[in-house]
Amino acid sequence: DVYKRQQLILDLSMKEVCDYIIESISKILESANISYVKWDMNRNMTEVGSLELTSERQRETAHRYILGLYRVMEEITSRFPNVLFESCSGGGGRFDPGILYYMPQTWTSDDTDAIERLKIQFGTSMVYPPISMGCHVSAVPNHQANRITPLETRGVSAMAGNFGYELDITKLSEEEKEELKEQISLYKEIRETVQFGTLYRLKSPFNSNEVAWMMVSEDKNEVVVSYVRQWALVNESFSNLKLTALDKDSEYEIIGEDTILSGDELMYIGLNIPELYGDYVSKLWKLKKKDL
């Protein structure tokens, strides 16, 4: 179906087309107090060609299209420096340094299921930093996987990047709204470490029933550790989660647990993973380095 969603692609290899888009979008942004724009990309390029080019130059079209797109983005983001623009990887596959130059964050995937996102975000983080990955809590049952994942785990999964929500809050219970408040408060506490710290992958979802990662703040004083178990196992043995990149001679306080462990203990013995019941369960720890 070349008419995806009844959409066609404008020929951005043509200057007049770029001029039209720049002015049209600028008028909209000037018409209201707009602070955030999601720049979606959902149409594949098919039957690529341009009326602007001769027959022997038609193979230049895709390249010139991207140059035109960069020009559009350069002009619009320069005109509106206080607007946060978010690009989209779903459909257009444009999660790349070229787009990130103009739009500092990208919607990591149109797949918003929290469990599917574990692999998506884990893989994306191999190339792009967490601050650039749009990661949102979505409604359940998930509209794609039809999976019901606990709100806590949806939150932990989304806090692996640029955190937000992708749901209708008017349909949430009062209890869920309170949990959202707690999640937002928590993310504000850990945001600097998540977005500007160093990411370490502890367990991969590609070869394990578990996934875990940790972020260490720039000053090495704060640590955020996230853990998700995908499916429950009968008679599963107790296990620890070994951390990395800590100061072995320093002590770390586990916030909220009244526990202090040395860096040596955390790296060679690990954090005790508590008893977790059911599928799609999670745990997030905050650690703070203590002054000696």
Protein language model features and the residues they cover:
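Short, small-residue-biased leader/transition segments that mark boundaries at the very start
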Residues: 2-3
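Conserved N-terminal phosphate-binding loop of PLP-dependent enzymes in the Aspartate aminotransferase
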Residues: 49-52
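Active-site-proximal substrate-binding groove within the catalytic cores of carbohydrate-active enzymes
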Residues: 70-258, 275-277
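C-terminal beta-strand-rich structural cap/linker in extracellular carbohydrate-active enzymes
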Residues: 261-292
